Amino acid sequence: TLLLVAGGSSDDIELGAIGSDTTSSIRRERSPASKTKNILLLIGDGMGPNQVALARFATGGPDHRLSFENFPITGIVYNHSADSLYTDSAASATTWATGVKTKNRYLAIDAEKKFLPTIPELLSTKGYKSGLVATSSITHATPAAFYAHIDSRYKEKEIAKMLVDSDIDIALGGGQEFFDVTVSQDNPFMIYDKKLLDSTLLNSKEQVIGLFAEDGFDRRLGTPTQLEMTQVALNFLENKSQSCAGFFLMSEGSQ
C-alpha cells in the first residue's frame, strides 16, 4: 500500500509525504518485482508547517516526530492556482486529483473549462475501486475534485448528482442538504445514520454514500469520526479489491 499525506495552509504551502505500509520500527523489505496495489491519500485541511509543529509538540514534545515525518520521501510545494498566487481548496485539490493547475473555484476542469480525468476515473478503467472520506460535506471542494467536473465549487446540488453518477464506490461525509436521493436499498445505498456504518452490511453493496450531517460535521452532535469512517471505507474497499486490481482512498480531515 502506498500512503500519501498532503496538507494546505493559508500561506498556500503544501506538505507532501510518501511512504509504504511500514513503520519506522518495523520495516519490511519489498521485493524489487513487487508492485504497489493500493493507494491512500490523507489530506489535512489547513495543515501547514505550523500545524505540523503544534501536533508534534502536543503529542511528544519538540524532539518527537509524527509518523509521516519518518516516510522515506517528504517535500514542500508552493501550489498556486492558474489565476492567482493564492490557491483555494478547489484548485489545489484539482491539482492533486488530476495533475493540472486550474482557476480558483474550478473542479476537475482546466483554466479553459476542459474536462480533466481524475485519479478515480483513470484507475476505474484499470479495474480499481475508489473511496472518499471527509468531515466536511462530501460535496465540498476537496472531495468533489476527485469526481466532479464543474466551474464552481459552490454548485453543490449539481456536484451531489455527479457523485451519484460517478466511479466512486464509497463516499462518507456530510452534505445531506445537497442530495435529493432518499435513504434506500437501491444503488447507491444511501445511509444517514451512524449506526449503519457496519462493514457486514455495507460490504454487500456495490456503491455506498453515507451522509451524517446536513453540511459539515459538528462533533458535538455525535457524528462519526474521520478514523471511524476511514476504517469502514478501508474494509469496504479491501473486500471489493479481492476481485479487482486494487483501490484508491482519499481521506480528508476537513475544516
Where are these predicted regions, by residue range?
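N-terminal Sec signal peptide cleavage junction
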Residues: 7-9
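Anion-binding catalytic surfaces of enzymes that hydrolyze or transfer phosphate/sulfate esters
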Residues: 196-255
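Hydrophobic membrane-insertion alpha-helices, especially the h-region
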Residues: 1-3
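N-terminal catalytic scaffold of extracellular/periplasmic and nuclease hydrolases
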Residues: 12-207, 214
